[in-house]
């Protein structure tokens, strides 16, 4: 995993696993809302009434509806609770 992905992937994975509602703001100002269904290196699948594939290069900000605790790199995600 590249250094740039070391925070992004665990953060998105926690949001996905805990089904945290998120607001995603795109670079053009559009606000999308839903839950992260899955993601990869290039896209996020956002589910609300429909599923939307959102390209990461179009995303400005991801705002969770509640505070998220990100485990440290040497701490497994399951131990973070």
Swiss-Prot record:
Residues in Sm domain copies: 9-68
Superkingdom of origin: Bacteria
GO biological process, one term: regulation of DNA-templated transcription
Pfam families: Hfq
GO molecular function: RNA binding
InterPro entries reported in the protein's UniProt record: Hfq (IPR005001), LSM_dom_sf (IPR010920), Sm (IPR047575)
Record keywords, A-Z: RNA-binding, Stress response
Keyword RNA-binding on entry: yes
PROSITE patterns: SM
SUPFAM superfamilies tied to this protein: Sm-like ribonucleoproteins (SSF50182)
A GO cellular component annotation in the UniProt record: cytosol
Sequence similarity: Belongs to the Hfq family.
NCBIfam families attached to this UniProt entry: Hfq, PRK00395.1
SUBUNIT field: Homohexamer.
Classification via PANTHER family: RNA-BINDING PROTEIN HFQ
Function per UniProt: RNA chaperone that binds small regulatory RNA (sRNAs) and mRNAs to facilitate mRNA translational regulation in response to envelope stress, environmental stress and changes in metabolite concentrations. Also binds with high specificity to tRNAs.
Protein name in UniProt: RNA-binding protein Hfq
Organism annotation: Marinomonas sp. (strain MWYL1)
The encoding gene: hfq
């Amino acid at each position: 995993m590249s250094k740039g992905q070391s925070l992004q992937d665990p953060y998105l994975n926690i949001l996905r696993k805990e089904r945290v509602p998120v607001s995603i703001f795109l670079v053009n100002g559009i606000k999308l809302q839903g839950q992260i269904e899955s993601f990869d290196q290039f896209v996020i699948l956002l589910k609300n009434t429909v599923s939307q594939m959102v390209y990461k290069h179009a995303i400005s900000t991801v705002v969770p509806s509640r505070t998220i605790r990100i485990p440290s790199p040497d701490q497994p995600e399951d131990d973070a609770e």
